[in-house]
Amino acid sequence: PKGIGILSLSGTTSAIGQDILKTRIIVKPKIISWEQAFGFELSEREKSMGCIYMERLRLINDQPVFYDITMIPNLNLPRFTSRTFENKSLFEILRKHYQLEVKGGEQKIQAITADDRIVEHFGVNRGHPILRVDRKLDTNRIGFSFFSQIYCNTEDYSLIGRF
């Protein structure tokens, strides 16, 4: 399999390249309430403000490889839900428009099997092996982290990263 540097701070778009990476929006950014974020604890402050929730499908050479669910605290991100994310880098939008840069974080990696939702997005059989990465991404803004759950079809691509 070819390597994809998703396990880094740079983000998927910069690791793969904008030319071969496409992004389809499954659920447009919307504000919802939240009590937890993929198993990561939230502060009372984070819970009270709600989050911006979105789902994206990332394709490499038109093949679905990542199904990404993102939850971002709804705090000082004006017009975020009205932005276009189709074929755009989330990290770049956060950096350019909100002066937020990912500085580190925590990730949990687990092997699972494809459920109906994954079958629909990846076009694989039910039970197909899938890698799930739950991430808490810390930023340069003190006390501001956001969260993602990424389902990875590693059949043709492996995940790589330096540590």
Protein language model annotation of sequence segments:
Residues 1-49, 78-103, 158-163:
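HTH-adjacent hinge/linker in prokaryotic transcriptional regulators
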Residues 68-71, 95:
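A short alpha-helix capping/helix-coil boundary motif
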Residues 28-30, 57, 136:
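Residue-level recognition of beta-strand microenvironments
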Residues 51, 56-61, 70-75:
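Anionic-ligand binding region
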Residues 47, 60-63, 75-76, 82-84, ...:
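C-terminal regulatory/effector modules of DNA-binding transcriptional regulators
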Residues 25, 53-54, 67, 132-133, ...:
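Hydrophobic residues on conserved beta-strands that form the core of alpha/beta folds
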